[in-house]
Amino acid sequence: PDDLLAVVYHMIASQLGRVRFAAICRSWRAAAHCAPPVPALPLLLLSPRDCSGTKAHLHCPEDGAVVPLRLPRKAVIKCIVGCHDGGWVASSLPDPFRIVNLFSGAEVPLNKKQAIISCTSRYHGSGQVQILKVVFSGPPKSGECILAALTYNCGIALCRVGCPNTGWSVEGCPNKPIVDILFWNGELYSLLYDGHLIKFEIGMNEDGAPVITATHWLVIHRIGRHQRGILQGLC
């Protein structure tokens, strides 16, 4: 019965197991297709790869399985700085900046301005900016997807994939180092080295490129030294 198949499908822990379930026969594939999406941990791309850069292994944290992956020639990359559901990764090396799919080899078209982040700050000289991390506001194939890049010494840079005539907007060189950035429910957040959490409001300039229009410092509950020691003792 279809109801029983749906129950069994939801009991499968790993994404690999669900793929194998759907491959058994037509009725099982139909049951998997009709079932609501099951939350899953992301697959981990293991390093090192072979010298050619075309072979890799994926690790499934849910069941510990290691799956071999042959990368399409177009997807050969050396430095992954971000990812999105469906096998999409952002690569900063070799130049230029690219967004490719590890499974299909498809690539998101970017113009020359979007392929390189440049900063004109007088504090450390102009030139290409080193990217530490890139986060996506939505699917990279969407025309509304905004990219936020955490850079080495130029703060946050923003780019809209669906804007063919615009590039990256570098949002200043902060005095306090940024540790991490994240899109959550369409909002961009950053965590500073000193523990402060910031939420950014993003608008569009006259060219349609994304820019930060407001900054909100959020109130967070800090863990004191005494509480931190207790937590470390419990771990």
Feature annotation, model-predicted:
Residues 15, 19, 33-54, 73-87:
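Beta-strand-rich domains and repeat architectures in extracellular enzymes and scaffolds
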Residues 6, 26-30, 54-56, 65-67, ...:
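N-terminal, well-ordered alpha-helical segments
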Residues 11, 24, 47-49, 61, ...:
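Acidic/polar N-terminal loop/beta-strand segments that form early-domain functional surfaces
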Residues 1-23, 27:
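N-terminal Skp1-binding subsegment of the F-box domain
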